[in-house]
Amino acid sequence: MKVENHNLAVASLKTQRISAFKARLVAVLLKGKKVSDALAILSHTKKKASPIFTKLINSAVANAINNHGFEHSNLIIKAAIVNEGPTLKRFRPRAKGAASQILKRTSHFKVILASQNGGESQNQEYQETEKNLVSKSPENTQSGALSQQSQAEQPQNDPENGVDSQLSAKTNSITTAKKTDLADNNTKNDATNTVLAQEKEVK
């Protein structure tokens, strides 16, 4: 007997000598039924899996009532699960030295009971667990880390932009100074040329 939370009770039985296909024909009839209705259905179902499910339901009901104080009338079957177990392989001798294979299949049974009164709290717990799983998912953690890195890089980029603007201002001032020097040199050359021309005319 396993108890997952305050509103669910799980009873399991393993390695039963029945195929999962045949057992699931009975499991389909039990899902969503009240415990009393499920036991009535099993009592009128002539299948090999019927006594197995009856045993599981009675065990889960007894533990739920004794451990959690649930009322028998409020219990419903939330799920009846049948999984495949290990398969035993045997051989049957046939004619002319041949042999045919025999598969003895087994199954694992699980019945989950829920309380009708605790449905709202159960849904709240389920939603909270979903939120926690989503918040702890690797995609969200990576996105959060990237956002933190981008926020950390933004203030570092601002001083770099300031340095770049200062360098561009210095280069502009240097180019303007060079242009003014060239203009002064040109004016000086023009003045010397005019003086030389006047001297030649005088001679």
From Swiss-Prot:
Under the heading CDD domains, the entry gives: Ribosomal_L22 (cd00336)
- GO BP: any one term: translation
Q: Which InterPro entries match?
A: Ribosomal_uL22 (IPR001063), Ribosomal_uL22_bac/chlpt-type (IPR005727), Ribosomal_uL22_bac/org-type (IPR047867), Ribosomal_uL22_sf (IPR036394)
Region annotated Disordered, chain positions: 116-203
Q: Which PANTHER family match?
A: CHLOROPLAST 50S RIBOSOMAL PROTEIN L22-RELATED, LARGE RIBOSOMAL SUBUNIT PROTEIN UL22M
Record's subunit section: Part of the 50S ribosomal subunit.
What is the name attached to this protein's record?
Large ribosomal subunit protein uL22
Record the organism. Answer: Mesomycoplasma hyopneumoniae (strain J / ATCC 25934 / NCTC 10110)
Gene symbol?
A: rplV
